[in-house]
Each structure stands twice: as C-alpha cells, then as structure tokens.
C-alpha cells in the first residue's frame, strides 16, 4: 500500500550519511534522489524511506505521535540497527525488547533531527 514515507531533515549530507550507514545492515540502499532528497529501499517497486530538505525551505519538525517502523528481519537485526543508530548519534527512545509477548520485538530511536524510528520484528523470529 505505501510507496514511501518522507522525513524532513536539517542537514541533508549528515542525514544521508546516517541513513546510508544505518541501512547497510539490512541491505537497503539509496535507490533515487537529487540534491535535496534521497530515497532508500531495495528498489522503486517496494516501500521506501525518503529524507529531504523541506520543499518550502522552512525548518522541518518531527511529528508528535509520528513514527516510521522499519522491518528489521530478525530480533538480532533490531538490536544491531539500534546499536548502529546510537553509535551514529541517534538517541534512545526505547531500548530493544519484546513489546507484545511472542509477537512484536522493537527498538526505538530518534534520528539526528528528532524523527522517531522503530526497528521491529513481527511474528516468530
């Protein structure tokens, strides 16, 4: 259903480096973009995450209650993505752990611009 989700950033180069390094863990890469937007995914036919300098050139803001959940593929990958994000300068918004017994495992961070991300594994690992 979703084609892509966009997060506004304050420093495009810094954010691009953050997401490129972070997503290398789950074999997700830069699939398209230009000088103000970069889209990450496996290809343009699958859901992507975009980062951009807002088109109106006003300051971006992280939404209260807004979060992007990234399917990690395993609990170990959730842990690895979380650790990598923290090492790259993200802040903890909920350490890795089981949130719904035997079904949902997640780890939460705020990226360099305060956008909330969840690295998750749903179902059996």
Regions found by a protein language model. Name each.
Residues 1, 61-64, 101:
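Short glycine-enriched loop/turn motifs at secondary-structure junctions
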Residues 1-16, 68, 123-125:
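N-terminal beta-strand motif that seeds the catalytic metal site of vicinal oxygen chelate
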Residues 7-49:
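Core segments of cupin and vicinal oxygen chelate
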Residues 15-19, 85, 114:
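Conserved active-site tyrosine of GNAT-family acetyltransferases
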Residues 21, 25, 81-89, 93:
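Charge-dense, helix-prone N-terminal extensions
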Residues 38, 66, 103-107:
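Short beta-strand micro-motifs in enzyme catalytic cores
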Residues 41-80:
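Long, continuous compositionally biased terminal/linker segments
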Residues 86-125:
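Vicinal oxygen chelate
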């Amino acid at each position: 259903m979703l084609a892509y989700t966009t997060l506004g950033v304050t420093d495009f180069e810094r954010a691009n480096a953050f997401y490129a390094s972070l997503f290398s863990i789950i074999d997700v890469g830069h699939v398209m973009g230009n000088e103000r937007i970069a889209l990450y995914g496996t290809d343009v036919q699958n859901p992507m995450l975009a980062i951009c300098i807002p088109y109106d050139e006003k300051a971006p803001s992280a939404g209260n209650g807004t979060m992007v959940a990234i399917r990690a593929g395993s609990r170990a990958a959730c842990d690895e993505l979380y650790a990598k994000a923290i090492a790259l300068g993200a802040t903890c918004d909920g350490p890795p752990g089981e949130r719904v017994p035997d079904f949902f495992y997640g780890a939460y961070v705020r990226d360099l611009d305060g956008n909330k991300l969840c690295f998750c594994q749903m179902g059996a690992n």
